Amino acid sequence: MSDKKQPNAEQHEKQSKQHKVCLWIKRWWFSGTILVGLAIAFLIICLPYLSPEHRITNDHTVLLWYLGSLAVTCGLFLCLPKIVTSNTKKYFITRVLTTGITGGVFALLLPIAVKSTTTGVGGLRHSILLATGGLLAILTLGETRRKNDIDKHKNDQEKDKNDKDYRRQVRAERRERYTKAIEQLGDDEKASVRMGGVYTLVGLVDEWLEDESIEKYKDRLKEGQVIINNLCAYIRSPFTLASQHGKLSQNKIKSKNKFKKFIRKYIQRNFYINKANFQAEVDVRLSIIKEIHDRLKGPEENTPGAWSDFEYDFSGSTFFYPVDFTNSYYKKPVNFRNSTYLGRADFKDSTYEGRAYFRGSTYKAGADFKGSIYQEGANFSGSVYQWANFSGSTYQEWANFSGSTYQWADFSGSVYQWANFSGSTYQEWADFSGSTYKAGADLRGSTYQGRANFRGSTYQEWADFSGSTYQKGVNFRGSTYQEWANFSGSVYQWADFSGSIYQEGANFSGSIYQEGANFRGSVYQWANFSGSTYQGRVNFRGSTYQGRANFSGSTYQGRANFSGSTYQRRAYFGGSTYQGQVNFSGSIFYSKTYFGKDGHSKTSSCFTNRSPQFYDETNHKNTLFGSYNNDFTVDTNKGYPIGLNKDMPLDCELLNPGQKNYLKGVFHEMKKINNKILETKGSKENAEILEELRNFNKELHEWREEATTVKMEDVAVEDMES
């Protein structure tokens, strides 16, 4: 940033001379005085002609003309550009003498030009002398001010010149230090020389940022960014011994081979030489990381540091040493993509105002990103982790974790706008519990080789878990899905979806459950479980289906419990095979129910082991239906029939008018609550309304329990009547 050459003093004076006359005349105190003086002189000359007594005679006309000419000449002479623009002492004396002589002549001759009988001649002469003296005083003051202005201008010019020379010298010296520091940083022999170069460069960045002589802050940043780029480039540069990180991190060489004595000594000596060089380079690079890290932290938590305005590019780096960037604050984009971390990587409690790129990286040890805030996009896709902690983080735009591999991962308690975890592999446990997804959540096509926990999460828009494999069980208990949720085509060892709320559609079709599956106590708008296989027990007990429920074309190899549930719309069970015990007791089917052929299934259901249970003799629970127009046709060639009495399963009844009206009102209120939830999505009020829905569903469950419980007194009366 070199300074431009300034015009010298002579050029400046030459350029300004043509303006000085105007500047001189524009000074109101001087030009005004001259004009007033000339006006007074004009009045004095004209007064004798204008007076009533007509005091002037023809003999004095020449004298008056003389005095008038003298006054005009004096005025012109005082305003002569040569005199006005002159800085020399003789012209000031000329102005003073001209004024004095002119005033004296007027004081002497003007009274003569007036009749001798005129009174006040002495006063007139006295006034002229006073006016002349005042004019001389004004000229003196003007000259003094002019000299002061000239001196001040010269001093300012000198100061500016000295300041510019000093700044030019300082910046030149900085660039010399920068060049030398770069040479030191490239020294291959001594780590101490490289370390000196690091600290010099760090100090130069601080100096540029603190240089207030550079008015624009962005210009200071530009100078500092050049140095930051060099420091980042050094971190990115390859180091030959990095590939021996594991061996050189040990205190001594470990080898099972037996060598001859001299060979063993050579190997040991070479090991300690390499270890010393390795550790020296680690120290140099750690010093760079530490100096950057210290300046990325503000005085308070989550506040910017002195270097937070820079961009950092560590892409493609191999960190063969621990990396600590905790509590860092980045205002600009930061790039760590395609990097390899051989030691621990700690990025927790950091704030990223710009985009954060970590994709395509490999973490050989732990990676900690917990408690961080990403105000723009964050890309962690295609990475490999041993263990990774992203818990308690906030992603205000998009977050991409797709195609990654984790030994174990913790994403619990985080908040996402739009999140993509698709196509990832979790080799041990994965925890996503207690998280909030404000926009779409894409977790399809993932593989969970260990346990997975999604418990208590909220999905404010769509959530897609389709085509995933859970080899050791997964927990989705107590979650809320405010738009459609897709779990279709997945494979589960065991799965727990109990106590969840699905505001729109829930698709579990075409899935396989190798062991148990628990959907108990959930609330669905509409639900599709068709074409699924349950190799172990499955529990749908105590659920509420506000829309259609489709269980058609499924296979149940173990027990299937549908008891204690409420179906507001149609329920489809056709084309399914039930190989174990099936329980529908204590349920309410408000609309039609289909076990035979229908639009969803071309075949009827088949109960191969025993007939389904619609009446629980032990707990005295029956099933209530809202319509006679149901289809209980099942395949009796391969299984058991449904026992019927008057087109109704044995010991079951129709809803009475009072029960129907109650349910109609309940369903109407639940619909209103659902609409409120959709309207308040994303607000604090939303959680309260969700809790209201849970409480309302609890009341419905309690009412259903009472309504489906058969009172023993009534049974006894019926037996006596029969």
Question: Which residues does each PLM region occupy?
Answer:
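N-terminal leader/targeting and pre-domain segments
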Residues: K164-R167, R175-M195, Y199-V202, D206-S243, ...
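Membrane-proximal alpha-helical anchors
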Residues: G75-F77, V84, V114-E207
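Short amphipathic alpha-helical segments, especially helix-boundary/capping motifs
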Residues: E158, I263-Y266
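Short hydrophobic membrane-inserting helices
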Residues: M1-L139
